[in-house]
């Protein structure tokens, strides 16, 4: 699905939510099953959904999110031995770790986007999408294990490891297929299509002045700084608490405590981002209802107040164009 992103507010919202979901899964139990010697991941599923709904560029960005999250999570000292090679800070081949954790996930997102792009042009879309979702999990495993065999042969994993499936692998593949099919059905339903047209209606977009944008930017930076300082504070208090109970906190343990706090912060920021986006979507829909209520029922012509607001918006848009 090729998108011209300018003016597609609804698509921005949905992609933002899915990227936030990817970020949450990359840092929480939702994205990993910790079974020695190496964790099994489900965090590739949002990438497949994005590939189905949008395209290779967007799914590659989602792959980048997954890769960066995986690389950060593997940088902790408490992770399993098999997971440590995903971090450039825990191996003697840092470039190889970056290629393994980030490169393979970006490539996976790109390939899935290309596959769904071909499928969306075919006559048998549903069968094609189901098949694409089915091969997503083994394709991700093949890319990751294949890269491990090339970059880190001493790990004992190679492309053959991707064919050793257990119950968890079949369950993840089934969840991936279900997620893609349900997402596609909901996204292209008549209700969502109507809602999308409402959100993307240029007549309903609010004008944001430069001062308003700057104020919002300052507030976001301020809140983020407070959250970051709070993370450091709670990590420090956790160390203090262990000391009170007689547990000696070494430098490595202190690093892992802070590492976990940062993961928690990233997940909470993502959850709040999703909440804000949903509130914006509801607000825009309510503005649409207000807009339709101001229209004359017989003539379908703007009322006086709506017409004046529309003129003000047009003038503001013209001023923005002149300033550019």
Regions found by a protein language model. Give the residues of each.
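Alpha-helical transmembrane segments and their helix-entry boundary regions
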Residues: 58-63, 129, 133
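Residue-level recognition of pore/gate-forming positions within transmembrane alpha-helices
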Residues: 66-67, 137
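Conserved nucleotide-binding and Mg2+-coordinating catalytic segments in signaling enzymes
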Residues: 290-312
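Active-site-proximal structural segments of metal-dependent nucleotidyl cyclase/transferase enzymes
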Residues: 310-324
């Amino acid at each position: 699905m090729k998108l011209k992103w300018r003016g597609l507010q609804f698509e921005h919202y949905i992609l933002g939510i899915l990227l936030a979901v990817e970020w949450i899964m990359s840092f929480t139990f939702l994205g990993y099953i910790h079974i020695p010697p190496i964790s099994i991941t489900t965090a590739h599923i949002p990438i497949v959904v994005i590939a189905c709904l949008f395209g290779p560029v967007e799914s590659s960005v989602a792959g980048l999110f997954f890769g960066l999250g995986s690389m950060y999570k593997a940088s902790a000292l408490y992770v399993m031995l098999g997971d440590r090679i995903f971090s450039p800070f825990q191996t003697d081949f840092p470039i190889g770790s970056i290629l393994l954790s980030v490169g393979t996930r970006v490539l996976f997102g790109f390939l899935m986007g290309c596959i769904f792009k071909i499928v969306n042009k075919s006559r048998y879309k549903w069968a094609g999408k189901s098949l694409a979702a089915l091969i997503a999990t083994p394709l991700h495993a093949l890319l990751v294990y294949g890269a491990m065999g090339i970059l880190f042969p001493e790990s004992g994993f190679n492309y053959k490891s991707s064919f050793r499936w257990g119950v968890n692998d079949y369950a993840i593949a089934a969840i991936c297929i279900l997620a893609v099919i349900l997402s596609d059905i909901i996204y292209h339903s008549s209700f969502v299509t109507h809602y999308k047209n409402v959100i993307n209606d240029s007549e309903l977009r609010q004008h944001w002045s430069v001062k308003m944008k700057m104020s919002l930017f300052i507030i976001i930076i301020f809140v983020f700084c407070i959250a970051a300082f709070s993370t450091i504070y709670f990590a420090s208090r956790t160390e203090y608490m262990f000391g009170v109970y007689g547990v000696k906190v070494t430098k490595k343990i202190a690093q892992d405590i802070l590492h976990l706090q940062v993961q928690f912060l990233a997940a909470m920021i993502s959850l709040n981002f999703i909440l804000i986006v949903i509130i914006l979507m509801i607000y825009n829909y309510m503005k649409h209802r207000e807009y339709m209520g101001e229209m004359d029922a017989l003539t379908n012509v703007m009322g006086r107040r709506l017409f004046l607001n529309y003129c003000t918006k047009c003038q503001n848009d013209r001023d923005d164009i002149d300033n550019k």
